[in-house]
Amino acid sequence: MNKYEVVKLIGVGGEAKALLVKRINSDKLYVMKQRMFFLLEEANEGLCEAMSLAKIQSPYIVRFEEVFLDNNSNMFSLCIVMEYCEGGDLMDNLFKRISDSFLKNSGLNNNQNNNNNNNNNLNSIVNNNILNNNKNSKQSTTNTNSSGSNSSIASNTTNNNNNNNNINNNNNLKAYENFFSKYVPSETLKGVNQLVEPNCNKDNNKPIEITTTDSPRIIINDNESTNNLNSQSDQILQFSISSESSSFSNNDLINSPNSNDSNLHQSSSNSSICGDYSSPPNLEKISSPGTSTPYQKGSNGNTVNIRCSDIVVEAVSPIKTESIGCQIRSTTSPCTSGPTSPQMIPLNIVEQPPQSTSTSKTDSSPTGADVKKTKMTWWKTYKSSKKDKKQTICSNACESFSNSTFFNDPSSHSQPQHQQLHSSPQQLPQSPRLKPNIESSLNINGNNNNNNCSTLLKLPRKLFYTWIYQICLGVQSIHKNHLVHLDLKSENIFLSESQKIKIGDFGLAKKYENSMSGVAGTYYYLSPEILLNKNYSRPADIFSLGCIFYEMYTLNLLPLTKRSFGQELIEGKFDRKAFKQEFDDSDEPIADLILDMLNLDQNLRPTIDLILQNKLFERISDINSSFNNLLNIVNNTGSSITNSKSNSSNNLNNSNSNNDIINNNNNNNSSNNINNNNIVNLNNSYNNKQDKCEQRNKSLNQNGFLSTSSMGSISSSFNEHEFVRRQLEKNDLDAAADVLCEAFKEEPRFQFVSGATSDNLETKNKSIELGQTIRKSFFTMCVRLMFDNKFMLWGCFDYENKLIAVACWSTPGKSGAPPMTQLIVKILSMLPKFGFRTMKRIGKIMSNIDKAMKNHDSKLDVYYLPYIGVSKEYRDLGVGQYLLKPVIEWAEHQRKTVKAVVFSQKQINFFSKLGLSVGHTEKITNLKGINSIYVMSKNSQY
């Protein structure tokens, strides 16, 4: 601790606390997590766990700087120093994007530059709208006199323009309010769909009263609110997203005490016309020093503070849904949802006609012809909104942002991990989430583009896929180190200053050995098996990852919407159809992927490797591999230049020591020598790479099937992201047959079939040509037959999208080969082409393999690998192991056995590196050149 200086306390809870520190004599910031222990043995155990976490090396994991024990009086403090992420956490970022997007698109973010313009703050919107809606001849005369030389015609024109601006601003605020109403439990929305026209007081000096149906009165003081909006120095947008108790009722709002009016009136001076914020059950209230408390004097409860960049706006409460000049029509959405899925609340906002007689006639509600026209032009409107999505959603996608104060409310930060689950799921109310109807015209910018919230409130597409890809890479590095995070959530995913993803908070991480049990994590992200207190493992992280992806796409933050997918799955209330309706049609693949990750059966969830090989990430992985290749070239070039310069400088120093006087000619010669040395070294480095490639190709083993040389061990230079693995499609089958045909050229079983092991010299000479024909015909037939019978055909592609490796898997329940009837028919069709002798050899091979498999284990509930092959030029890069790992890990999660049949010791060595062992050896006497058939298997570890 003597090396660090505490800057501020970030969070406290239970036995642990988090500090923002900086190293003495340095301005670099770090995050230090301290945990107190009474016993030295427990502290040492925690130290060992922290050291194992520090071994994880990944750019997408929060870096551990230092881990040490500090003796503090009678207690021991375990201190973990980690890098500080300037970008904050992902939940802060998502919520700030929500607020900034609305403010940006509504034009409210220019409020600071237009403080004198009454149309740009909430108070003047209310006042001007009421004045314009209640115009009469006396008010018109007053306005004309106050304007000096302006004529009555100019006054009426100004009033009309102001009225239009007010309606647009009201629509902006209404869109903002309607979005955040998704964070309000459904009970509080009952009876609030119809708004009542406000009554205007003739005396402008009195507070203006705005009354709504089924909600308490709100009193806005004309003078105080304007001053407060301009006098706030912290620039905080305040609003509320739920009520006080966990059981919500609209009657509680109606039957509130009379003193509530005075409280509301008092809170208006603090810019808080809000209800209460109900923190999720897993969050704890922590008072952070140096930050303003979220509890405002005179408010009815917790007020959520959102820091905005330019203004202070007192948002209309979503619970009370007051708005002037707007009316919400409660219509039935064509996309109805399930029992616990989000309630669809279409928001058709239309302008209300003013309630006064005036010479200027305003528009009324849309007529039947207008409605018909709107329906006819819906698709064009939808297409235009999709086309302009990049302009409407957050344009500053990758821009650095300051930490939002929304989660300065410590209730939104995590508790100590051992206390994170203390509320019963049954006590949590179901909450609606708003999916705006495409036909609802929110008219954010005051034009007729009919933009909707789903268009406005969405992460930029490229940023979304980049972030989830980086998160997956971070989780992959965790699982590769045999760890399970167990507390993946958006609050534990951080952003660096350059907006790169960093996964942190490993307080609940466990070493993966066998399956684990016990409840751990954050309720809204917990998988069903954890909620049911069953055994769990890495699939629990996959489930949490699916929850995070859902949050990032829909911006429905689960701790605020009070939604638990795990609980819905357990109760059988999860509606897949309604879930997919929250995604655009063009993004159906990501919806399907998330649904797979949220599968109730943990054995059916994809592994992190399978997720990374999804087609969604192909382009990103190609870009990353190209970038990594470029970095390697730059690094190699830079190192060679550095070495050449150091060598030349050493030569110059030696010459200086021998000669005291150096003339200009010698200097010129030495500089020329330096340049020449650089060129020579660069050429040498390039030539060395070519020599290595040639040596590699020359040293390739001719055995093209399952040998250590043909498959290759993963070398230190192997980069997984240079290749893409995926399941093959129908148009890939011909290329797959070619790869297998070339790879099995020297494989023992095909050597026997082609006659290469025969004692007859003439047969040996014909074996090369015959073997090529046999392999080509056999694999063309076999690959198509396996594809038709739903075998798993995996392929690995290089950066040019060329197929370089193929693996054929039979899934549990299959016999390991295509149906015998179909196979016999196909083989008999080859009889006229190859003759009876060749077909007899094929039959011998197949019967011996089948015998070996049955003698080992006759169960069909296994993953069996009949064929795998890699192109010759890629056999020493570890492509074979890379291609097989996803299915092997998938089998581990499903607790299934993996089997393969091999014919040589080299092939045994290859599979041993993947965890397979020889389970049975079948001695062979009737196959020349083959002494034994080995059945290798890997049983599930849990």
From Swiss-Prot:
Catalytic activity: L-seryl-[protein] + ATP = O-phospho-L-seryl-[protein] + ADP + H(+); L-threonyl-[protein] + ATP = O-phospho-L-threonyl-[protein] + ADP + H(+)
InterPro entries the record matches: Acyl_CoA_acyltransferase, GNAT_dom, Kinase-like_dom_sf, NEK_Ser/Thr_kinase, Prot_kinase_dom, Ser/Thr_kinase_AS
Region (Disordered): 109-170, 247-303, 352-371, 408-445, 642-686
Active site per the UniProt annotation: 487
Coiled coil ranges: 675-703
Protein name, entry field: Probable serine/threonine-protein kinase DDB_G0279719
Lineage, uppermost ranks: Eukaryota, Amoebozoa, Evosea, Eumycetozoa, Dictyostelia
Biased composition (Low complexity): 258-272, 353-367, 410-432
Induction, as annotated: Down-regulated by phagocytic stimuli.
Binding, ATP: 10-18, 33
Entry's family note: Belongs to the protein kinase superfamily. Ser/Thr protein kinase family.
PANTHER family (UniProt xref): SERINE/THREONINE-PROTEIN KINASE NEK (PTHR43671), SERINE_THREONINE-PROTEIN KINASE NEK2 (PTHR43671:SF13)
SMART domains with a match to the protein in the record: S_TKc
